[in-house]
Each structure stands twice: as C-alpha cells, then as structure tokens.
Amino acid sequence: MAGTPDASMEEILWRSPPHVQMMGGYLHSNNILFYFAESPFFDPTSNNASLAIQANYNEAFRHFVETREAFEGRLKTMQGLEFVVSYDPIQAAAQPDGRFAHEPSNIWVIRKQNRRKRTGLDDEVAVLSTYFIVGDCIYMAPSVASVVGNRILSAVTSLTSLLKTASTLPTFTPSHGHTYMPPALKQADASQPGTQSQQSKENTPLPDADAAGKASLVGSSQMVGAGSSLQDTRTLAESFNLLRRYGDEFMDEHPLVGEPGSFILSRVNDTDRTSAAKPPATAAKVGTPQVRVDTPGKVSEKGATPSGSEENKMRKKKTKVGS
C-alpha cells in the first residue's frame, strides 16, 4: 500500500502543451490517463504503468490501451495501486440518442486508489488521493486535514491580531472595574421617588461624570502629544471652575446642621424650611459686667434714684448733723 501523499504536492500545478499536441491536440476519454501519466503525480510502480509497458511489448495486451473502458476493465482484474477516472464530463453530458444534454465541461477527476482482492467477496478499494484536470492543468485536491488546518490557522491568526489590538483598550475605574469603552451615564428618572432630593440645586456633577470627563481628557492628551501642555492647563482651569461653583455643596441626604459640638441630622426640606422661617439672630453685645457700689453720703454717678430704705437712712443722718 502506498504511503500518504506529500503535502508539498498540493501546491503544484502541472501542464504540458507539447504532450497535448502529441496526443491529437485535445484531451478526451481515451488519452486522459496517459496524459496524467506524464505528470509528477503519477506513480511508476502502479498497475497503470505495468499494463502500459506490457502493451508496448506484447501484442496480446495492445487492445487494452486502445479505449479507456478496456484499460480500466483490465485494472479491475489486478490487485494493487491504480489510477482511474472518477468523473468524465463527456459521459456526464451524453444521452442515449447520441446528443449532449448540455455543453460538456473540461474538468476531469482522477482518483488514486489501492485495490485488494478478496475471495468470494467484492474488491476492497481504498481511495488515497484525488486529482482534477481543468483544461490541460493538473491539480491535486487538498486533504480534509489540510483544509481544516488552514481554516484554524487563519482563525488563530485573526484572533491573535485582535487580542493585540484589544489589549490596549481596557480602562479601569473603581465604580465600573475594567471596561473597554467609557461608561455611559444613566439619566435620572424624575418620576421615581427619592430622586428629587438627591439632586443638587445647582446640578452638582456626579463623581462618575468627573471621572469620565477626566478619562476622556487624558485619552485625548495621550493621542495628541503636541497639545499636552495646553490640555493640562485647560484641565486645571476646569477643576478650579468646578471648585468655585460647587465647592460648598454636598450630596448628603441628611446634612448636618447646628453648631460645632451639637450637630443635628436633618433632612434637606427641613433645613430649607428652618432657614427660611427663622430670621438671622443678632449677636449679643459682650462686655465687662458692671457692679454698683454705693458710698454713704455720695450720690451715684449716673444720678440714679435711691431706694426707700436708703432715703430714710439719709434723712436720719442729715437730722443728726443739723442738731
């Protein structure tokens, strides 16, 4: 049994116009196998070669090479490696009345097979390889393993190039993890309860929005190397602008109110009502406490009127001095 065909034979195209001219100028059913015998695909140890040599030196075998039917009929009585025509375009288009059902093509199919005789049973035929002839060009049909291997290699090559390109795309953010595209912000639904209280009066930007904006700015600065310094300056100015506009605002659902040491948790609506209803308290004047000391016989500097007991004492003292 012949070995497996060489893989390099699948890449060969063979043609010989001089041999076609020697065989009558065109290929037909009776000379197609002899034209194939001139190609490198032919095996000189096959039954075809031995039968052709016998016909050249033995007149009894001459009629076997005159027609393809007689040649292949003789090959069926032999055991071993052989080449037979699997598809004849002329026979495929011929009809019993001698006319053609369609225009015959110029494609022939030849099989390389091994025949083994079995007593009382049909011959065991194993197909080793297939060849096809288009015009005067002979090709070897690729095996199934070669076709599947080529497709797998093409797929792996494409996946390798894809992974090389995709390896530079992922970005990481604490809120979304590893992503290939910047995360899109979800629009808040005003109809849902609780969303109104979570929104700031001045539309405070969300942390994800700042992260997405900074990520886009960083990506653009890496792509455009010439304008990196200008982009950095613009980013810094935007940061200061956001700090100036929203630096004193918070997104706490229950903000802290009160003085240091006595903070109280309250809701946003309660805080607004309290601040709107309560007028601003005026700061009390802080000064040194005054203590009044009354000296006997001396009137207060501010001219304050003494009390009743003090007036009686003063009168008694004046009476004693007068007496």
Curated annotation (Swiss-Prot):
Xref: InterPro entries: Mediator_Med6, Mediator_Med6_fun, Mediator_Med6_sf
Keywords assigned: Activator, Nucleus, Transcription, Transcription regulation
Ranges of compositional bias, category Low complexity: 276-285
Chain segments annotated as coiled-coil in the UniProt record: none
Listed Polar residues bias regions: 189-203
Pfam families the UniProt entry points to: Med6 (PF04934)
Cellular localization per UniProt: Nucleus
Disulphide-bridged cysteine pairs: none
Any one GO molecular-function label of the UniProt entry: transcription coregulator activity
Region: Disordered, residue numbers: 172-213, 271-323
Basic residues compositional bias, start-end: 314-323
Function as written in the Swiss-Prot or TrEMBL entry: Component of the Mediator complex, a coactivator involved in the regulated transcription of nearly all RNA polymerase II-dependent genes. Mediator functions as a bridge to convey information from gene-specific regulatory proteins to the basal RNA polymerase II transcription machinery. Mediator is recruited to promoters by direct interactions with regulatory proteins and serves as a scaffold for the assembly of a functional preinitiation complex with RNA polymerase II and the general transcription factors.
Subunit structure: Component of the Mediator complex.
Descriptive protein name: Mediator of RNA polymerase II transcription subunit 6
Native organism taxonomy: Eukaryota, Fungi, Dikarya, Ascomycota, Pezizomycotina
Gene name of this polypeptide: med6
